[in-house]
Structure formats: C-alpha cells, structure tokens
C-alpha cells in the first residue's frame, strides 16, 4: 500500500516534533512519500522579500526553497530515504522507483504544497493521503471563535470543498485548496486530516482508526 503524508510547515518549528515524525515514518512497513510545507522559515523570508518589493513569483520561489530545506532536514533524519529532494513530478517518479521513502517540498510558483501532495499521491498510485495539519480535525466553523462549532469526523469531497471555499475555517488553504481537492477527488483518494502535533496518529490511521476527519468520494 502506498501512502502520502503531508506535513504542515509548522511542524518544523519544533525540533522534537520533527524527530518524532522521522521515527514514526521509519517504523511503518508501507511505501511512503512525504511532502513538507515551508512554515515559519518561509513566512519570515517571504515577509522580508515582500517589503523589499519582490514579485509574487519570487516570493513563491522563496517559499518553495524553504519547503525543500524542511524536506532535506527530514531526509537527513530518516537514514535510508531517497537522498535528493525532487523538484518536479518527473523527478519524484524517478525517486519513487527506488522503493525508498521520498520527501518533497514545493514544485513551482503558484502551487501550494497541498497540491503537490495531491499530485504526488496521484503519481504514486496512493490510496490514502494523511494531512498532518495545524488543527485536529475539520469543523463546521472556527472552533476558537465559535464554541458550538461541530467537529466533523466524516466528510464527502463536495462537503469539504464547500467548507474550504466558504473560508469559514481559518487555515483552510493550508489544509487543502480547490486544486488539491480536484486532483484527489478524480482519483478517489481517501484523505485524513489530523492534529499535526500527534505523529502517533499516522500509525493509528494505518491501523484503521480515525483520529481526525476522514474525507472520501
């Protein structure tokens, strides 16, 4: 079984958490690809570039290189992972044929790492994408502002897309965007969104549990 894990860039702001994810990924006997976000490193550099008048394309490139640096860090911790960070889908496929864990960051300007994760899942023939996010599940509204917001353990893609489009969930773009949803839906790939602070949830999901939100066709 092929599995893709999308790691929020925020995870890389905590050294201990990154180490725990490396151990979690090494411990599971499935074929895994990982896509990393840029996190605080990307935000800080992009902010400086924006103040200096850099174009949106150049700002995107900075974010891409930050995500690739996070990917390289994870590769260094995994030991036997593919040693290079693929920079496009062709390079990913070449790396994937090595039968080792492959870790990617961003691919091109104007494209989120959520979309990269969806493209990687499609190319790898993965049946599942695990999204280690900055929230523990998908909610009907922002639970930090609305204590009556409903936690949604199961969603269909159409329902999830409506939530993302409504922007009722802060960070929705980080969870997924409409491009990534479109790619995942056309391949009927099951998505789990779970608390990125809990690397042990990877094992729980692979055992058939649902610690967050499960999204299906």
Curated annotation (Swiss-Prot):
Keywords: ATP-binding, Cytoplasm, Kinase, Nucleotide-binding, Pyrimidine biosynthesis, Transferase
Residues that coordinate or bind ATP: 6-10, 39, 43, 134, 139, 142
One GO biological process term: 'de novo' CTP biosynthetic process
Regulation affecting activity: Inhibited by UTP.
Broad class of where this protein is predominantly found: cytoplasm
SUPFAM superfamilies per the UniProt record, alphabetical: Carbamate kinase-like (SSF53633)
Residues that span the membrane, as ranges: none
Reaction equation(s) it catalyzes: UMP + ATP = UDP + ADP
Annotated binding of UMP, by residue: 38, 60, 107-113
MF terms in GO: ATP binding; UMP kinase activity
HAMAP family: PyrH_A
UniProt subunit comment: Homohexamer.
Family recorded in the similarity comment: Belongs to the UMP kinase family.
Protein name per UniProt: Uridylate kinase
Species annotation: Pyrobaculum neutrophilum (strain DSM 2338 / JCM 9278 / NBRC 100436 / V24Sta) (Thermoproteus neutrophilus)
Species lineage: Archaea, Thermoproteota, Thermoprotei, Thermoproteales, Thermoproteaceae
Gene behind this protein: pyrH
